[in-house]
């Protein structure tokens, strides 16, 4: 004979947690989109699947760490520099060479080759300033967040086949379904038309026929469709 505790547990609505039930809860059934369902890998997590398919799992910015792909980690050797090398100063020859690289064949400076925030001074034969050319070339900010840089790089990548299939699936022509009025709605609109004609303000104030208090605009749209279906000319 079972004890009082065992009998109470048998009658309880809370069942014992078993491994079999837990595995059923962990199984994910992807049925939202046929293209994603076809390319889904059940051995990967949601974030890993979205990244593999070229999609974004979360629209909000990251709040924590990100899984590192060890297959793409490149081990770089430590650069060895001379202790007497001067990083702060730059020779006039190198500066002149950089300025010549930014200049075109006719001596004019190309703003697209000059980094943003810098400028080049163009002088004439006498050394007088002729023009100041400001650079427009975008540079990478070292203080910028790494996540923002990764996001910019991911946006420049070529779209995956799954993304291309989803875009073509979303841009397919969709036939618009025509809504037809039911027999009860047609009967109700007919009674309103017999009583009020095309006076929609009176229809809206009729508490006996307009029991759901449809607005003037809603009644006008319904009545316009009803008049067209019954081949009745609408009063201008």
From Swiss-Prot:
InterPro entries for this protein: Ribosome_biogenesis_Nop16
Alphabetized UniProt keyword annotations: Nucleus, Ribonucleoprotein, Ribosome biogenesis, rRNA processing
Keyword Aminoacyl-tRNA synthetase applies: no
Location of the region described as Disordered in the Swiss-Prot/TrEMBL record: 1-23, 89-118
Pfam families linked: Nop16
Any one Gene Ontology cellular component term annotated for this protein: nucleolus
One GO process term, biological-process aspect: rRNA processing
Entry's localization field: Nucleus, Nucleolus
Keyword Translocase found: no
Family: Belongs to the NOP16 family.
Subunit structure and binding partners: Component of the pre-66S ribosomal particle.
Function: Involved in the biogenesis of the 60S ribosomal subunit.
The protein, known as: Nucleolar protein 16
